[in-house]
UniProtKB/Swiss-Prot annotation:
Organism name: Arabidopsis thaliana (Mouse-ear cress)
Family (UniProt): Belongs to the ELIP/psbS family.
Induction: By high-intensity light, mostly at cold temperature (e.g. 4 degrees Celsius) (at protein level). This high-light-mediated accumulation is inhibited by okadaic acid. A stepwise accumulation is induced when 40 percents of PSII reaction centers become photodamaged. Induced by UV-A, red, far-red and blue lights illumination in a phytochrome A and phytochrome B-dependent manner. The COP9 signalosome is involved in dark-mediated repression. Accumulates upon heat shock but repressed at continuous high temperatures.
GO CC annotations, alphabetized: chloroplast thylakoid membrane; photosystem I; photosystem II
Listed name of the protein: Early light-induced protein 2, chloroplastic
Transit peptide, residues from-to: 1-43
Gene from which this protein is expressed: ELIP2
GO biological process, one term: response to UV-B
Region (Disordered): 46-80
Bias type Pro residues, positions: 65-76
Localisation: Plastid, Chloroplast thylakoid membrane
Length: 193
């Protein structure tokens, strides 16, 4: 047993040779056997196993210093599409924002004209409002599409009080308000204000 233990410990102590036992004439004798050097390469991946500091280590060898790991490369944002079909798609960035901007201008203009002339929305449209509507629509659509074709999104430039989310919500309320104004004036037959 002592010979086997000594033999196993000598494997680590003498990397160029190994002590072996041979049975010669019914007696065990130790022999030094020369072996070719063997390279060992560790290919483990992941985090190394950490030892519990409360348990004393039985190993006499010091752990090699850890190589500093480089940080992972930054994740690049996907490029935004600037194709006309993608911008005006149902889930694209342009339709709701453009319609909201038009509704905000339309709601304020309709209320202002009601206060100044006393006409309802339908009378305003029939008195030359179609030309103003088409001109405003073309101007706001073009002004809204130019930054989108350059790849600039409203979300990237929104800070402080006037954010892109606030613009979307104001546009949604203006769309509802304009429809509610027209419906109320149609049902009552007169102006709201």
């Amino acid at each position: 047993m002592a010979t086997a233990s000594f033999n196993m410990q000598s494997v680590f102590a003498a990397p160029s040779g190994v002590l072996t036992t041979r049975n010669i004439r019914n007696t065990n004798q130790l022999f030094f056997k020369r072996i070719a050097p063997v390279g060992v390469r560790c290919m483990a991946q992941g985090d190394p196993i950490k030892e519990d500091p409360s348990v004393p280590s039985t190993s006499t060898s010091a752990t090699p210093p850890q190589m500093p790991q480089s940080p992972p490369p930054p994740v690049s944002k996907p490029k935004v599409s600037t194709k006309f079909g993608d911008l005006l798609a149902f889930s694209g960035p342009a339709p709701e924002r453009i319609n909201g901007r038009l509704a905000m201008v339309g709601f304020v203009a309709a209320i202002a004209m009601e206060l100044s002339k006393g006409e309802n929305v339908f009378a305003q449209i029939s008195d030359g409002g179609v030309g103003w509507f088409l001109g405003t629509t073309a101007l706001l659509t073009l002004a809204s599409m130019v930054p989108l074709f350059k790849g600039i999104r409203a979300e990237a430039k929104s800070k402080g009080f006037m954010t892109s989310d606030a613009e979307l919500w104001n546009g949604r309320f203006a769309m509802l308000g304009l429809v509610a104004l027209a419906f109320t004036e149609y049902v009552t037959g007169g102006t709201l204000v």
